[in-house]
Amino acid sequence: MVQYRVPREELPYDSANRKSIVEYAQKLVGRTLRDSCDVDSFSSKKGNKGKLGQAIEYCYFEYEPNSAQEPDFPEVGLELKTNPVKRKKDKTLSAKERLVLTMIDYCALVHETWESSTVLSKMGDMLLITFLHEPEKDEFDYEFEFVGTPSIPPEDMAVIRDDWETIVAKVKAGLAHEISGGDTNYLEACTKGASAKTVRKQPYSDIMAKQRAFALKSSYMTAFYDKNICLESIMRRRGEESMGLEDLVKARIGEYVGATNIELGDRFGLNPRSKSFNALLTKAMLGVGQENEIAEFSKAGITVRTIRLEQNGRIREHISFPAFEFADLLAETEWEDSEFGKVCNSKFLFVVFKKNELGVYELRGCEFWSMPAEMVDAAEATWKETRRVVERGVEFIQGMPYCKDGYPTIENNLPGSDYNRIAHVRPHASQRAYRFADGSVVGNVARDASELPDGRAMTKQSFWLDKGVVEKLLKDRGY
């Protein structure tokens, strides 16, 4: 039962009128919470200014925050949700976090149907309030970017339903402790609690499972916010309307199995020597234009990588992810909301080429894969260790051999490929670059280096997935 701080007739909106609530909420756009209402009462009462969502409820809508399952505005069935966004270097917006919908009760979940599910009711009618996260500002000074009642398209809701059924099936199989964000596409079961060690009982196993909540993935929310992304869905042919995404992609790419990269380049008018060849080829095989992004992949945060197998099934290089800035890495405090965490908790699509007897790479197929829970934990350990080393100060260790630039080799104590054989850190630049404590410089620091907290700089780094993980996966799947 909602408890209002003032008599209902004194509220600045009509709590029994949906239009009145939405119009009142939309007055926040372009303003801050401090501009819009008295926030002092909340800060002194709650003693915690980190809960902006609760402050919106308490100060702006003037009701007591609660954890009840009923809608926040029960008279009209409207659910209030807040979500932070961040502005990227290209000025576009991306979701900083997933949009949490509701906590998961494993024991109750197995008795729900999709139509009666708690998560469907939470998505039924949402009032979404989005604010721009700027870490240098007080939370009450964040500007509100979007306020509205978004509707989820039917084609997306079909994917979300499949995701929900995937999660329920895992709980019914007694595998709630093995749930991973990579199991699903748009809807995920993310860890939720004081720490990842917060656990709950599950109905069909004695193994305690991490406490989780249903949430729309940050990749899905980014596709909603960033209207500059040109999304194009994979066209379905007659009879493919009910085909799942993975089966659809495998069928499309399967049409070209046996063709070499050179033949495929000729077929689609692509240059195999171009850096963008692999990405453009995947789009071409799926019938998506070169200038557009694959809608289903963008919304699901699917990471696509082209894998080149040698004749013996080995891969020459580890699998890289985008380079990171050390300042951005340290600004990430929660694993699941970190850039690397989002990747590890989403699906991968490996497009597989294998060298034939003529020494030419030919397409063998594609494989979807998500990291098992224990691998996600190992990747998290790498992320945490990297942050720890950077915070304490990266050690530069000079070696004996000299490089082409005339300076000795320089090792460091970031977690390398032998750290846990799952994920590691290594350079992500074609040329090395350093700035030392005495101000001396090696290489092009502005282009190839990232600044450390102590003012030194070192070659840009990125997280890498160990090639042995992918080699074993593909071997087990018959490549």
Per-segment meaning from a language model:
Residues M1-Y479:
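Nucleic-acid endonuclease domains
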